[in-house]
Amino acid sequence: MLKKIFLVGIGGGIGSVLRFVVSLLIVRIRFSIFPLTTFVVNLLGCFFVGILVGLSLKNNWLDENVKIFFITGFCGGFTTFSSFSLENFQLYQAGNYHTLVLYILINIIAGCAAVLLGYILTEFF
C-alpha cells in the first residue's frame, strides 16, 4: 500500500510541474477570453488516459503500478478540475455567459473525444 501511495505522489508531482510548464508556454500565446491553458492541459490528459486505458486493456500491457503512477498520479496531477471550475465561475462573474456555456460544452465533448481517440490509437500498437 505504501508503494502505491508513493507512486501516486511522485506521478502527481511530476504531472503538476508539467502542467505548470505547459501553462507558462500557453500563456505566451493567449489570444482570447477563452481559458486555453486549462482546456489544453485537460485535453492532453484525457488523450493520455485514453492511450493508457487502451494499452492496459490490450493484452495487459501495463503493470498495475504503472497504471497507478500514470493514470492516478501523473494524469491526476497534470489535469485540473478545480481550475476548470474556477474559470467557469470567473466567466460567469464577468458576464461572459456565451463563452461560459461554450467552454463547458467544448471541455466535456473534447475531453471525451480525446479519451476515445487515445484509446482508438492503441489499436495500432
From Swiss-Prot:
GO molecular function: fluoride channel activity; metal ion binding
Keywords on record: Cell inner membrane, Cell membrane, Ion channel, Ion transport, Membrane, Metal-binding, Sodium, Transmembrane, Transmembrane helix, Transport
Transmembrane segment boundaries: 5-25, 33-53, 66-86, 100-120
Highest rank taxon of the organism: Bacteria
Binding site residues for Na(+): 76, 79
InterPro entries for this protein: FluC
Means of activity regulation: Na(+) is not transported, but it plays an essential structural role and its presence is essential for fluoride channel function.
Record-level GO cellular component terms: plasma membrane
Membrane topology: Multi-pass membrane protein
Localization of this protein: Cell inner membrane
UniProt catalytic activity: fluoride(in) = fluoride(out)
Record function comment: Fluoride-specific ion channel. Important for reducing fluoride concentration in the cell, thus reducing its toxicity.
Entries under HAMAP family matching the protein: FluC (MF_00454)
PANTHER family xref list: FLUORIDE EXPORT PROTEIN 1-RELATED
Family listed: Belongs to the fluoride channel Fluc/FEX (TC 1.A.43) family.
Protein's name in the database: Fluoride-specific ion channel FluC
Lineage: Bacteria, Pseudomonadati, Bacteroidota, Bacteroidia, Bacteroidales
Chain's gene name: fluC
